[in-house]
A protein has these predicted regions:
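Extreme N-terminal, non-catalytic leader segments
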Residues: 1-22
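Glycine-rich, often acidic-flanked micro-motifs
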Residues: 16-30, 44-50, 54-208
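Conserved glycine(s) of the Walker
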Residues: 33-34
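Post-Walker A alpha-helix
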Residues: 38-39
């Protein structure tokens, strides 16, 4: 399916996506990096959910990249469900391997496609470290963008992107702000993460 989207100049990106004032932010990262936890924090502060696991991104016009909404549902692991004071008996159990539940988000869901304003890649570092949010440039920016594309493993195993495909990605990242956020392991730093996103990415220090 991801290949069909690619042929239509649309990418399937492994990420969450939220909307704020008509602009979309996609949140990518490895399993355990804190995507769902950060997304939940953003939803509690005025952002709206667009997608929880996969975002379809239209790159046909590189200066106006569009994110499409998916389903009004978020997948949360058991400890996140308890932290948000939700009753597991009211939720659908959907993943035995990772012990996850489906949480309805109809009350804070964005149903319309939105312009992609930025991409955020999460990673975890030592527990005594600070939360760091930095903008990526050059080669690092392109690699981070490619690595979160669902087709990246296939292209890598087949010898890499062809010239035309690589050009699509290059043109997209030239105009797309891309950030890396590093958070400490084992510590709830979502308040600080929220503040940095509001200040650096959305240029606002006010809570919504």
């Amino acid at each position: 399916i991801a290949m069909l989207f690619w042929q239509r100049n649309q990418l399937a990106i492994h990420c969450s996506a939220v909307e704020h004032d008509g602009n979309a932010l996609i949140i990518a990262g490895d399993s355990g990096s804190g995507k769902s936890t950060l997304t939940t924090k953003l939803l509690e502060n005025g952002f709206r959910l667009m997608t929880d696991d996969v975002a379809i991104v239209d790159i046909s016009a590189q200066d106006n990249v569009i994110v499409y909404p998916a389903f009004p549902q978020q997948k949360l692991c058991r400890d996140a469900v308890h932290r948000n004071h939700l009753n597991t008996e009211d939720l659908l159990y959907i993943d035995e391997d990772r012990d996850k539940f489906a949480v309805p988000r109809r009350d804070c869901f964005c149903e319309s496609p939105c312009k992609l304003s930025a991409m955020l890649c999460l990673s975890v570092q030592n527990e005594d470290s600070d939360v760091l949010l930095t903008e990526l440039n050059g080669h690092q920016k392109l690699i981070s963008f490619l690595e979160n594309n669902f087709l990246f493993p296939m292209f890598r195993n087949s010898g890499g992107f062809c010239t035309e495909d690589m050009q699509k990605c290059l043109q997209t990242v030239q105009t797309l702000p891309l950030y890396r956020m590093m958070r400490p392991f084992g510590i709830d730093s979502t308040d600080i993460q929220l503040q940095k996103i509001q200040k650096i990415i959305f240029h606002s220090e006010e809570d919504n």
